[in-house]
Amino acid sequence: MEEKQILCVGLVVLDVISLVDKYPKEDSEIRCLSQRWQRGGNASNSCTVLSLLGAPCAFMGSMAPGHVAFLVADFRRRGVDVSQVAWQSKGDTPSSCCIINNSNGNRTIVLHDTSLPDVSATDFEKVDLTQFKWIHIEGRNASEQVKMLQRIDTHNTRQPPEQKIRVSVEVEKPQEELFQLFGYGDVVFVSKDVAKHLGFQSAEAALRGLYGRVRKGAVLVCAWAEEGADALGPDDKLFHSDAFPPPRVVDTLGAGDTFNASVIFSLSQGRSMQEALRFGCQVAGKKCGLQGFDGIV
């Protein structure tokens, strides 16, 4: 029987990436070392990583005329199923200008988040849930995404344990509307930015302070850059993995998406939370030593 897919729901962006010797001063002109187009967006990047790791995966997000040919071709080149894409007749596919500092790998992003509508609960109603073993949702239009998550919950109540879809949610941006998503999903990824916005100064403090927001039995995960990542589960056991920095950091764009995808992949393969956390940090660390995603495995 064909292996079920992992579905990632969220954003796809055209990233125009300029690699520079050092970050430019305002009102200056510099030459870049190189420039490339790259398919970006959190859910889109996570699909790239899942596919590179060997997982059958699909992307669901909104797309519109514009840079679509490049983006769709790149999804297909990576073996990512785009049959769930919500095609929009109005608006433009988002794009971003990304500047990567070659001296330290830091990335600065200027996003043109266009008027393109996000995937709606109505769009999600058309999805055949039986195709998927795991669905990951990048927090965006939370009120609609709650309806999507409730649909998955309803579907799962009618399934035997081995057929239930596992669900993960990413709360990355410090926006109040997104915080309702904490209450959904078997695995919830909360970002360092959100944790600091809510007053926490470490991953462990964030997990202990926010765990009361997640559903019974869920695992809350927080990556903290060079300090590694922590996870907290229902038995109050804290897991930790150190970071695995590369010999030289060259490109951190998409490192968080790489971490999330690697944790999801590992858990979907039946690994323990400790193993998944370590694997996520290892793959994300390797990615930081590479331009783009090729070579992470």
Swiss-Prot record:
Enzyme class, first EC level, given as a word: transferase
Gene label: KHK
A biological-process GO annotation: fructose metabolic process
The UniProt record lists the keyword Transferase: yes
Species whose genome carries this gene: Pongo abelii (Sumatran orangutan)
Name of the featured protein: Ketohexokinase
Notes on how activity is controlled: Requires potassium. Inhibition by ADP.
Annotated function: Catalyzes the phosphorylation of the ketose sugar fructose to fructose-1-phosphate.
GO terms of molecular function: ATP binding; ketohexokinase activity
